[in-house]
């Protein structure tokens, strides 16, 4: 905690004010990624018990993975590394197909983990790959001028993921923090989108 806090403090002191959105995007992505990894570890260890906990773990990992990869794309765009909006042919169909596939695989993980021991590792890997690709594909077509709104939405996603993982771990602090971040990110997104 001290090492991570020290790095974050140092980065916050040296980053230019004009580069603050990029820093927020990266920090937000790390939060979403951490929430997703917590779920992966809990599934791999066989520590997810009951359909409600398994469902929340899958939802948290899906939302956290989307927030992670989407935040990385947002950072790359704001930093000028990824200059053009990338749009796939039939983008909406691809988004829907990836979303349905990730949700379907998540449902399979939930049903295979409840009462059957740890979920198969390959199912988890495939699920995370789908979720990460979904986050990148959803964020790639959006232009740089709209990235602050996207970052705010992804921030709300990270809050939801953290809240779900707090329930999975039985940690009220994570649940409360996730609810606060999710609600404030949603409110900020609505205000910025007007």
How does the language model describe each region?
Residues 3-4, 8, 12, 31-34, ...:
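Alpha-helical transmembrane segments in multi-pass membrane proteins
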Residues 32-38, 42, 64-77, 99-109, ...:
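Helical transmembrane-bundle signal
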Residues 51-62, 123-127, 169-184:
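Loop-to-transmembrane alpha-helix initiation sites
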Residues 5-24, 71-85, 134-147, 189-193:
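C-terminal ends of transmembrane helices
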Residues 41-49, 111-118, 144, 149, ...:
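Transmembrane helix-loop junctions at the membrane interface of multipass transporters and ion channels
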Residues 10-20, 36-51, 73, 112-116:
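Transmembrane alpha-helix boundary signature
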Residues 19-31, 85-97, 147-156:
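Cytoplasmic-side transmembrane-helix entry/capping segments in multi-pass membrane proteins
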Residues 77-98, 109, 115-117:
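Glycine-rich phosphate/diphosphate-binding loop of Rossmann-like nucleotide-binding domains
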